Amino acid sequence: MQPKFDKNLLPIAFDLDKEYLFEQALKRPRKKFYFEGKERSDYYYAPYEPEFLKKYIQEAFGLKGRWNMKFVYLPASGKLDWHIDKGTKCSINLVINNSRAQVEYRDRRYDYTSAILDTSKEHRVVNLAGERILFKVSCWDMTYDELCNIFINKFVK
C-alpha cells in the first residue's frame, strides 16, 4: 500500500544542527540569482556542499541522480512571487532562522520548518516580515512522490 501524503508539501521531522547551518550561512558570500536573463532582487543563494554533509543527506534521503545543496536568502519585506523552480522536481527545505513566512501553492498555504516540497508546481513565499534563510537540497532527477515515499518508508513506518 502506498503511503498517503499531501500533494504539494510534506512536513518532516528531520532536524540538522540549525545553529551550525545558520553560522555557516552568515559566513558565505551571497550570489545574485538570474531568471530569464534578469537579476532577481528577491532571491540570493550560496552553494554549501561539504562532503560529510553531502554523504549524510544522500544516505538519509536515498537521493539519486543530480542534486545540490545551498543556502537560500529571501530578503525582509521581499516577496518571492509565483514561480516553478528552474529544472528541479522537488526539494528538501529547512528554515534555519526564525522566519515565519509561508509557502503558498495555488490551492493552499503551508507553515513549516522542515519539509519536502514539490518544486515542479507553481508556488510563492508570502509574509516575509524578516529575512528568511533556508538550507535547501534541490533535486533534478527525483520526483516529489519518489522522495516522499522513500522518506516515509524509511522514517515513518
What do these predicted ranges mean?
Residues 1-64:
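Non-heme Fe(II)/2-oxoglutarate
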Residues 1-3, 116, 156-157:
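Fe(II)/2-oxoglutarate
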Residues 66-68:
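Structural/interface elements that position substrates and couple domains in central-metabolism enzymes
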Residues 70-86:
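Conserved short histidine dyad/triad with adjacent acidic residue
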Residues 89, 95-111:
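A short beta-strand-loop-beta hairpin characteristic of the jelly-roll/cupin
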Residues 90-95, 114-116, 129-149:
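A short hydrophobic beta-strand segment most commonly corresponding to one strand
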Residues 107-128:
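Conserved metal-binding segment of the jelly-roll/cupin
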Residues 144, 154-155:
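Low-complexity intrinsically disordered segments
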